[in-house]
């Protein structure tokens, strides 16, 4: 029986600090979900239009990484990170003052750009200091800590909205940014030595080389489909849980957070099992759980069981997502040995750009009730399973090497 290789204390400390940075993106998504119906009423617009504030955030999060990745390979990790957090803070404050939809969309776009820079740095720093099994374990540990965001953020956001309104939620995001900025300035070192920095010249050729590498492209597409599933869930959950299942904003935050625990548990399981089973097998197992969970939720809702069927089904699906996410991320990032900032940027851009398509589709389908939304999730789960199987079949040697000693 294999013994799990423990991560050094320095890596654990780095992961904790990086996780606080990585939380900014998910918190910017999850914390204000319960507020969307109230935001639509106050801004005199539709729920679908308010959902655009999530869509533009995701598009900026994806597209912004393409611009930021080469910068971090050229300038190092630390200075761009601090700049990105500062932009995130200012944009959150601006969003809290929005009195019309256009202002909100502009502020959220800027906030997404700031979050994009932070995500590129987080992914790159992990690969700066680790590779192979240790990188996979670090990614899993990172996802475990970051997994607290979908658990806590909706509950905190729901409570803030219930007592102080949605503007307080945006100010809470700004406060989280300030805390992250202080922690990063004090405890996150530069991880890219000057000797390893690269010129931004030929950026398009670098991106083309990475994108055409099947060892990168297949796990990147599978990971993108996984996030598409996640944002399809996020895009419809607020309306379906509150309108169709009768939950209040605060109750929705608690229920949504409870299903988010599954992502946390899945990431923990992935970190513990990766050395024994390898990332390929874990990713296939996780994707199968996603499909099964979504299918169970759909069948239960169709049979009239309502929220009693949907929540357990989604718990299974999101547990599988937590397993698959870290494994696929390690496979994609492990495919490259240089220009890691650009690799992380391209991975994030593909992931977030495709994921952003899920939220307006899910929001539109959820207007028709739970069944169309859950059918959409099941189809997305089928896509995840197909892409993950393709990744595992085409990359058996590469995948196994990440899971071996």
How does the language model describe each region?
Residues 2-7, 189-220:
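Juxtamembrane intracellular "pre-TM" segments in multi-pass secondary transporters
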Residues 331-367, 377:
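A late C-terminal transmembrane helix in Major Facilitator Superfamily
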């Amino acid at each position: 029986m294999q013994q799990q290789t423990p991560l050094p204390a320095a890596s654990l400390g780095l992961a904790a600090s990086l996780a606080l940075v990585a939380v900014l993106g998910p918190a910017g998504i999850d914390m204000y979900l319960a507020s969307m119906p109230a935001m639509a009423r106050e801004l005199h617009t539709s729920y679908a239009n308010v959902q655009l504030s999530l869509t533009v955030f995701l598009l900026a999060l994806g597209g912004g990484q393409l611009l930021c990745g080469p910068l971090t390979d050229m300038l190092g990790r630390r200075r761009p990170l601090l700049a990105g957090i500062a932009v995130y803070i200012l944009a959150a404050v601006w969003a809290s003052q929005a009195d019309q939809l256009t202002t909100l969309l502009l502020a959220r776009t800027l906030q997404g750009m700031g979050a994009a820079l932070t995500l590129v740095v987080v992914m790159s720093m992990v690969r700066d200091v680790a590779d192979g099994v240790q990188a996979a374990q670090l990614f899993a540990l990172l996802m475990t800590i970051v997994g607290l965001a979908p658990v806590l953020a909706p509950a905190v956001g729901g409570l803030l909205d219930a007592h102080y309104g949605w503007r307080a939620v945006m100010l809470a995001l700004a406060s989280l940014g300030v805390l992250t900025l202080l922690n990063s300035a004090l405890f996150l070192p530069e991880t890219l030595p000057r000797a390893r920095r690269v010129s931004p010249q030929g950026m398009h050729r670098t991106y083309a080389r990475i994108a055409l590498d099947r060892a990168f492209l297949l796990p990147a597409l599978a990971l993108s489909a996984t996030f598409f599933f996640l944002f399809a869930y996020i895009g419809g959950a607020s309306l379906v849980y509150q309108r169709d299942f009768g939950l209040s904003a605060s109750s929705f935050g608690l229920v949504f957070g409870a299903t988010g625990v599954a992502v946390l548990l899945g990431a923990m399981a992935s970190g513990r099992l990766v050395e024994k089973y390898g990332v390929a097998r874990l990713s296939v197992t996780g994707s199968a759980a996603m499909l099964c969970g979504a299918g169970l939720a759909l069948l239960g809702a169709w049979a009239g069981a309502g929220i009693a069927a949907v929540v357990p089904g989604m718990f299974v699906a999101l547990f599988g997502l937590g397993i698959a996410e870290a494994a696929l991320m390690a496979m994609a990032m492990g495919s490259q040995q240089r220009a890691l900032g650009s690799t992380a940027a391209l991975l994030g851009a593909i992931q977030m750009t495709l994921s952003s398509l899920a939220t307006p589709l899910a929001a539109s389908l959820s207007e028709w009730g739970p069944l169309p939304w859950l059918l959409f999730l099941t189809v997305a789960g089928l896509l995840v399973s197909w892409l993950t199987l393709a990744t595992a079949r085409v990359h058996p040697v590469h995948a196994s090497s990440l899971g071996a000693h």
